[in-house]
Amino acid sequence: MDSIISAASVIAAGLAIGLAAIGPGIGQGNAAGQAVEGIARQPEAENKIRGTLLLSLAFMEALTIYGLVVALALLFANPFNS
């Protein structure tokens, strides 16, 4: 029974980090593309666009870090083992 719990924890950790990276990865690509397009249209607004982009990228990256924390908790501080 303990080996089943360990195997399920490893699979869940892999899914947690994998799924946590997909959404922010797509979002970061879209945000960067739109920022480049906005800077190309309005070069004078480059500083404002860049600041907003960096802030939004940090928020998106936080989601991936939360997934990593969950995966590490499942692997090393496994709450399912007694």
UniProtKB/Swiss-Prot annotation:
Coiled-coil ranges (or none): none
Q: What does it do?
A: F(1)F(0) ATP synthase produces ATP from ADP in the presence of a proton or sodium gradient. F-type ATPases consist of two structural domains, F(1) containing the extramembraneous catalytic core and F(0) containing the membrane proton channel, linked together by a central stalk and a peripheral stalk. During catalysis, ATP synthesis in the catalytic domain of F(1) is coupled via a rotary mechanism of the central stalk subunits to proton translocation. Key component of the F(0) channel; it plays a direct role in translocation across the membrane. A homomeric c-ring of between 10-14 subunits forms the central stalk rotor element with the F(1) delta and epsilon subunits.
| Highest taxon above the source species | Eukaryota
Keywords from UniProt, A to Z, are:
ATP synthesis, CF(0), Chloroplast, Hydrogen ion transport, Ion transport, Lipid-binding, Membrane, Plastid, Thylakoid, Transmembrane, Transmembrane helix, Transport
User: NCBIfam families, from UniProt?
Assistant: ATP_synt_c, PRK07354.1
Other noteworthy facts:
In plastids the F-type ATPase is also known as CF(1)CF(0).
Tell me, how does this one assemble?
A: F-type ATPases have 2 components, F(1) - the catalytic core - and F(0) - the membrane proton channel. F(1) has five subunits: alpha(3), beta(3), gamma(1), delta(1), epsilon(1). F(0) has four main subunits: a(1), b(1), b'(1) and c(10-14). The alpha and beta chains form an alternating ring which encloses part of the gamma chain. F(1) is attached to F(0) by a central stalk formed by the gamma and epsilon chains, while a peripheral stalk is formed by the delta, b and b' chains.
Q: Where is this protein found?
A: Plastid, Chloroplast thylakoid membrane
Q: What is its main location?
A: plastid
- What protein family does this chain belong to? Belongs to the ATPase C chain family.
Query: Which organism encodes this protein?
Result: Thalassiosira pseudonana (Marine diatom)
Q: Recall the GO molecular function terms of this protein's record.
A: lipid binding; proton-transporting ATP synthase activity, rotational mechanism
Supply the InterPro entries for this chain.
ATP_synth_csu_bac/chlpt, ATP_synth_F0_csu, ATP_synth_F0_csu_DDCD_BS, ATP_synth_F0_csu_sf, ATPase_proteolipid_c-like_dom, F/V-ATP_Csub_sf
- For whether the record's keyword set contains Transmembrane helix, the answer is yes
Regions crossing the membrane: 4-24, 57-77
| Site, as annotated: Reversibly protonated during proton transport | E61
Q: What is this protein called?
A: ATP synthase subunit c, chloroplastic
Any one Gene Ontology cellular component term annotated for this protein: chloroplast thylakoid membrane
The Gene Ontology biological process terms listed for this entry are: proton motive force-driven ATP synthesis
Annotated membrane topology is: Multi-pass membrane protein
| rRNA-binding keyword on record | no
